[in-house]
Amino acid sequence: MGKRRWSQHFLRDTSVAQFITELVPSGLDIIEVGPGRGALTLPLAEKSKTIYAIEIDPTLAEFLKRQAPPNVVVIVGDALEIEWPRADFFVSNIPYSITSPLLLKLAKYRLPAVVTIQKEVAERLVAAPGTENYGRLTVAIRCHYDVEVLRILPPHVFSPPPKVYSAVVRLTPRRPCVEDFENFQRFTARLFSTRRKTLRRLKLGETEKRVYQLTLEEIVELYKKHFDTTETCRS
């Protein structure tokens, strides 16, 4: 069992592991964050060129090194802090405590991915404009990806079982909606801090449409009109 401070819930259901493994194309170099005891790592290794397994827990990393075949490269470190190896695909049962920052880092690499995340986060990723779940994370990820929720997972498929349901999500890269993602993130962070205000009140337009009702395309249009590398969102 992993350290609780890293919010690790290990996949224990082999049928779910098989389902996820079958979503990953064969013969690729794979980055896996949070491999734990290797529930996904080992079956993925059978069909992949190389697995770069990034594990923050040194004890789990040593365990995996003893169990894994030669094409699994175990990297001990914080996936949020280190530079990732060059790879073709990303897989992760993402630790709950780092879900949003890890997804945002993944977006910078633009790797195709299959991730397991909290169901509520998955609902945010596919949320429609004008709904409560729609927000900055929705916009940031869909700037780079088409998002599909493929399967809902009950708590008992993990050990220890989390208190919430999870979801298997496929992220397919699309043409980025902007060139400078860092600036776009700063813009959307400021914009969604006033998510219920109208564009008229924010002096970003003449419409009474509220921030959380804007489509991705409308947000990109605002970004290009009102924001560059030296200024912040006008409010």
Swiss-Prot record:
It holds the Pfam family RrnaAD. One of its GO terms (molecular function) is RNA binding. Disulfide bonds: none annotated. Its EC number is 2.1.1.-. InterPro entries: KsgA/Erm, rRNA_Ade_Mease_Trfase_CS, rRNA_Ade_methylase_Trfase_N, rRNA_adenine_dimethylase, SAM-dependent_MTases_sf. One of its GO terms (cellular component) is cytoplasm. It is found in: Cytoplasm. Keywords: Cytoplasm, Methyltransferase, RNA-binding, rRNA processing, S-adenosyl-L-methionine, Transferase. The keyword S-adenosyl-L-methionine applies. It is an enzyme of class 2 (transferase). S-adenosyl-L-methionine binds at H9, L11, G34, E55, D78, N93. Its main location: cytoplasm. PANTHER family: DIMETHYLADENOSINE TRANSFERASE (PTHR11727), DIMETHYLADENOSINE TRANSFERASE-RELATED (PTHR11727:SF7). Belongs to the class I-like SAM-binding methyltransferase superfamily. rRNA adenine N(6)-methyltransferase family. RsmA subfamily. This is Probable ribosomal RNA small subunit methyltransferase A. The gene is rsmA.
